UniProtKB/Swiss-Prot annotation:
Residues 1-11 have a biased composition (Acidic residues). One of its GO terms (molecular function) is ubiquitin protein ligase binding. Keywords: Cell cycle. It comes from Homo sapiens (Human). Residues 35-51 have a biased composition (Pro residues). This is CDK2-associated and cullin domain-containing protein 1. Belongs to the cullin family.
């Protein structure tokens, strides 16, 4: 008897739990459907108390309930509104995200060590002002010395890649101002020594030595300016609004050319009056170089500059044609006095005539055979 009662109680409890789970499943499905029509007025059916979200999970008395609906006389609890089901779903998703976050591995010590290592490497690459003065500038100083004193065509045993890298690192470490100051000071000291050597030169070697100094310096600039291109781009052009090449040319003008122009120009005019006292290439290099340094110096000797630089003099005037012809005749007489003859005025040269005659004779002899 007791066993049958226990079985009936167990069966009723299981049926109640099945019905409860079925009702919960139907409520969850109805939450995603379209909302039901509004309930009848409160006068006909009393409004039951609204249960909080999840109230369906609370224990209820064991009552036999049909699976298809409640029995007569037992009111059915209200359906949870869609909003409550949405909140439940959102809470479940948040709980799932929190569970994933908890399951994610915490940052290990190796990642922290890698960050610290990269930071320490960055700090180790910092170039202090002491490092610049003791390591980087001495390399640049030695390379500049070799470039300024090289002769045209000489091989210089320096690494352009190493010098370029030194300049790049110093610019990145904010040493551009100090490097530019050291470069200007270095080249200024070199040009002052060159000027003193020219002052001690005798007159017969003065023009030739000035030509060597000018050509050597201009050739050195073709290597120095590209090596300091980063300093020129990110410091001189942006902060000083100038160009490195213009600054270095100005140094030669101020420290060498301006100090020697009044001694050099009379010697150039004298050499011009005496043909071939100075080679034409030397004369052309000096005149073109002076015009590059300071175009205003053309006014000191317009005739001299006009022989090597076009369009210096004003255009010819018809009234001065006789004067131009007289100058040309004078120049031709000077050439004759120095051993230059006019020679044969025909288009053929003597050697060509002999070669033509011999070839024609050979052809005729072959034809008769």
């Amino acid at each position: 008897m007791e066993e049958s009662m226990e079985e009936e109680e167990g069966g009723s409890y299981e049926a109640m739990m099945d019905d409860q789970n079925h009702n919960n499943w139907e409520a969850a499905v109805d939450g995603f459907r379209q909302p039901l029509p509004p309930p009848p007025p409160p006068s006909s059916i009393p409004a039951p108390a609204r249960e909080p979200p999840g109230g369906q999970l609370l224990a209820v008395p064991a009552v036999s309930v049909d699976r298809k609906g409640p029995k007569e006389g037992l009111p059915m609890g209200p359906q949870p509104p869609p909003e409550a089901n949405g909140v439940i779903m959102m809470l479940k998703s948040c709980d799932a995200a929190a569970a994933v976050a908890k399951a994610a591995p915490a940052p290990t010590a190796s990642s922290t060590i890698n960050i610290n290592t990269s930071t320490s490497k960055f700090l180790m690459n910092v170039i202090t002002i002491e490092d610049y003065k003791s390591t980087y500038w001495p390399k640049l100083d030695g390379a500049i010395d070799q470039l300024l004193t090289q002769s045209p065509g000489d091989y210089i045993p320096i690494s352009y890649e190493q010098i370029y890298s030194c300049v790049y690192k110093c610019v990145c470490q904010q040493h551009s101002e100090q490097m530019y100051s050291d470069l200007i000071k270095k080249i200024t000291n070199h040009l002052e020594r060159v000027s003193k050597e020219l002052q001690a030169s005798p007159p017969d070697l003065y023009i030739e030595r000035f030509n060597i100094a000018l050509g050597q310096y201009m050739g050195a600039l073709q290597s120095i300016v590209p090596l300091f291109i980063y300093m020129n781009k990110f410091y001189i052009e942006t902060k000083l609004n100038r160009d490195l090449k213009d600054d270095l040319i100005k140094l030669f003008t101020e420290h060498v050319a301006e100090k020697h122009i009044y001694s050099l120009m009379p010697l150039l005019l004298e050499a011009q009056s005496t043909p071939f006292q100075v080679t034409p290439s030397t004369m052309a290099n000096i005149v073109k170089g002076l015009y590059t340094l300071r175009p205003e110096w053309v006014q000191m000797a317009p005739t001299l500059f006009s022989k090597f630089i076009p369009n210096i003099l004003p255009p010819a005037v018809e009234s001065e044609l006789s004067e131009y012809a007289a100058q040309d005749q004078k120049f031709q007489r000077e050439l004759i006095q120095n051993g230059f003859t006019r020679g044969d005025q025909s288009r053929k040269r003597a050697g060509d005539e002999l070669a033509y005659n011999s070839s024609s004779a050979c052809a005729s002899s072959r034809g008769y055979r």
